[in-house]
Structures are given as C-alpha cells and as structure tokens.
Amino acid sequence: MTEKMQARRVQNPINGLCAVLPKNNEVMLMKISENCYKLENTANPISPNVFCADPTGVEYNGRLYIYGTNDHQEYEAVGDDGKNDYVHIKSIVMLSTDDMVNWEYHGFIDIAKIAPWIVNSWAPSITSRVEADGKTHFYLYFSNSGCGVGVLTAEHPLGPWSDPLGKPLIYQNMPGLENCPAPFDPGVCLDENGTGWLAFGGGTPPASNTLHTNIPKIVRLGKDMLSFDSDFVPIDAPYFFEASELNYENGTFIYTYSTDWQSRENWNRTDVPAPGICSMGCMTSKTPLDPESWQFKGGFFLNAGDSGMDWCNNHTHLIEYKGTRYILHHTLHIQERTKTKGGFRCMCVDLLPYTDTEFPVTKATREGVTQTQPLDPYKAHSGAEMFTCADMWYEQISTGKMAVKSLAEGAWTYIKGVDFGKGTEKLLITAKGMGVIELRLDDRNAEPLGVIELANDGFDKISVVLPTKITGIHNVYFAFSSKDICLERWQAERKE
C-alpha cells in the first residue's frame, strides 16, 4: 500500500457530485474498526447492534417481519454498568428480511406515544388477516408490563400503528383471572376460519404447586380481534413460568411456553422426560377450550445455558418462511462481546423442523441459519439492511425507514451473498455527510473498489462509476471514513 491516494473523478450525472475512484491500485486505506459484536461468519444474532428480545414474526408480501422487546431502550437508560430490569422499555423493535441473514432495521414502535396508558411494553405477538375491505390488517398484542395485555392495529407491518381500545385488552384481577397473577406475555394465532385465539399468563405459584399451576390461560377472540368470545380457560402446563405463544396447524393448536427455574424432583411421568430448567415446553390440543384436551409433548428448546452460552430467560416463536421452519428466540450473544453484563438480550433464529405432532429437541446456536437466496443488488436496498457491522447506528428517515449512520472513523457495514450476475459498473447511492464511503468486496480489509466522496448536509443521490466491473456473488462492505456519514439506500445498475 502507498501512503498517497491517486484517483480519477467522475462527474455525477444526477446532481453534479463526484464519485472518487481508485486508479492503479494506489489507494490509502482508512483504519477499519474492530468493534464488531456479531461475527462475520455467524448468522446469530439477527441484529448486530440492537439489544432486543422476545421475538414474534409475520410474513407479508414475501418478506418476514419480526418484532421484539426493545432491550436497547433499557440499555440506553442505565448504561454499561446497569441491569436490565425492563422498567424503561416502552417500545417494540422492528426488523425484516427476505433471505434470513441480511436483516433491515426499521426502528421501533413508540408504544408510549401511541398508547400513553401503558406501564411498559414487552414480549409482542403478531398476526394478520385479509378482511372484508380487501386489506391486510395486522394485530400486535404486547405485555403491558406484568399487569396485562394491550393491542395495536395497522394496515402495514411497519405501521402507522394505532391503539383501537385506548386501554388494556387484559388486566389484572379481571373476572376469570383470579389464578393468573401476571396476565402478560400474549401469544396469538388464527385458525382456518380466521378466528383469533390468545394465550397469556405469568406469575409465581405457591411453592407447593410448581408442577400444575394452571396459571396460563387461552381465550377465543371476538370477530374484531379486540374482544372475547369465550371464557378464559386454564392450560395445565407443567412447570409453567411465562412466554406463551400459539401456532395453529392441521387443526391442532400448538402452545409453547417457558418452564421455570425450579427443581424437577417432583416429576412423576414416565412417558415423557421432565423439561429442562427454563427450557421451552410444548402442548397441543384440537379443542383448546377443553382444559382436559391439552397434551404435554415435552421440552423442545433448551435454555442458552444448556447450549454452552450464558444463561438467560427464554422466549420463542415458531414460524415457517419459504417452506422452512424456524424458531425465533433470544440469547446474550452481543452482551458476551461488550462491556455490559446487565442481561441485555438479542434476538436469534435457528432451524426447527417441527410438525403438529413432532417437536425435536434443539438448542440455540451461534451459527444460525443459511441464506435462502442471494441478495439482488439491482433492487434498491436500505443502508440499514445488513448481516453485521462495526461502529454503526441509525438515523430515522420516516416511519419504518432508517438510514445507517457511522459512529466513528472506519465504521463499516457488511451485506452477505450479493449476486451481481453478469455484472455492473455503476452504483446508485443516497447518502450524506463529510468524508468518503468505500466499497469493498469479500474482505473488510480489502482495497476499495470504489471511493465515494461526500460533502453534503442533506441526502443526495450519487451515481458511482466503478473502475472494474463486478460480476458474480460477493460479500459487500461499505466503509465510512468519519463520524456521522449516513447511507440511506444503495442499488447497482445492471449493465446492458
């Protein structure tokens, strides 16, 4: 490498800005950040820099949207030395993907602003259906701290969201919940008729009754998804603790939940093993309003502590996407690589080939899942869509739309498995800031293929003519020379 950078300038045909491009391999590389909390060779966690937990998900127009408790809001309130007590969390994080490894961060739903009556907002569960108006309606249920359940609605998975009730849907001490001290952690599903069902519950049972608490409840929702069409019915979930979720398949309701931290000394069944400590348990029923119909299928997802990682609480969601079945969950992956030890969680995804009758025991992994298909660079992509990054954060553009923003010199983002096909010689980007963005391929320390010079306070569209045609599949890095450079969007232009 030489100390000097020689480059040619190509006039931007859109707005007159210049793209600075390397020539004769004589470039000066910026110092690349090592502050990467998600490794470049592991697909977990989902977000490389946002603490979030208790995942749920829904598919819309071929894209998977997931939502979770915004642990990062707590982290920002208490800092590295603080503990995650969840008391400052009043929002829900949103991310999405169409390949299961590159995830776009969409910001958060400001629950406190939409529903100012809340105490906190944790552990969402979402479903959607096409209704009589021909539109898809989304219903997002969430824990109002440990004292109830609220619900938001929208006509798009990113909102805008509204609070149709203006109050909790479920609250402590409402009739029928005498044996449910903490009616939170909702799990929602739809049956084949589009009827909604909701499970929930939590709280500590008497010490003498940890095995059969009957604390969790299930209820059939009204046609509006905002009321009830049955009594609250108990589910006899062994060693129940929290984290209810519901799925429906082939006429069978699948109820999953987190077991507690208690000893299993009083387990008295021989047909199925006792579930592990704070593992996920599973029950099924074809007639969910009959308490006797629920059958315990066993523990199916180990605690992270039994998977060679730090112990933490447990919350999962089963989901099928593009013909493959996954389990969404959380661990402490990011925390393990940072200064904090306060219990700040991160959402993850692993394979779980479940059916309505079989639930293979699996565990959390660092490796995660594989890319379902290469990323298409000839479609516009948000700068906030990535596999991992270092020293990056976000700037909101509009509801559900973010730009990625550098926090320091040498910050970078990494997009995995980008298929340029027969080739491109031009990129179109929308960016702002003072400095340069470098385009690198396959290695964050590689020499830049293109260097885009920025000197603008507002977002500008920039056409970047590359000195070398890019063909085939590559991992793409955008490196940032200084703080406060924002990349909103990028796209390759197909070579004719």
Q: Which ranges hold each PLM region?
A:
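Carbohydrate-active catalytic/glycan-binding domains of CAZyme proteins
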Residues: T2-E496
